[in-house]
Amino acid sequence: MAANKYTGTQTEKNLQEAFAGESQARNKYTYFASVAKKEGYEQMSALFLKTADNEKEHAKMWFKELAGISNTKENLAAAAEGENYEWTDMYESFAKTAEEEGFHELAAKFRAVGEIEKHHEERYRALLKNIETAQVFEKSEVNVWECRNCGHIVVGTKALEVCPVCNHPQSYFEVHEENY
């Protein structure tokens, strides 16, 4: 990732706090929108969502200043590292503290989320490996490929360059899975 020109400064801390605050506000407003919608306040729900979108853009602006966004390969590596920290250190530490303080159900939830974070790390590492081995759109074995835009199905070792149905590029193809 690119160097963070603010490293070690109070400005860096301010940017980190701004990013965290905007990110948390976005999530809160999304949750609030769901409540407003359930209670029959469609306009208020829409305004919470509109504001959440604004907060997302504010957070993105601060994250970019911190050099937190790179190319997909580096983003996958950073995401895997973050997920690794969450499942190996953060949630386990939180679970131990919760147990010590008598919150056993919460400790179990922390550990359960830690297991989910472990899966997230594995997913990101597998996707990173696909990029590194040039196997995102071409596999060594025959697969069923599906256009994520229109649903067109093709069987082969490689996704089509262009979908013949909707003309979307190869980037819209993924290995088709049915999990139902």
Regions found by a protein language model. Name each.
Residues 1-180:
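Non-heme di-metal
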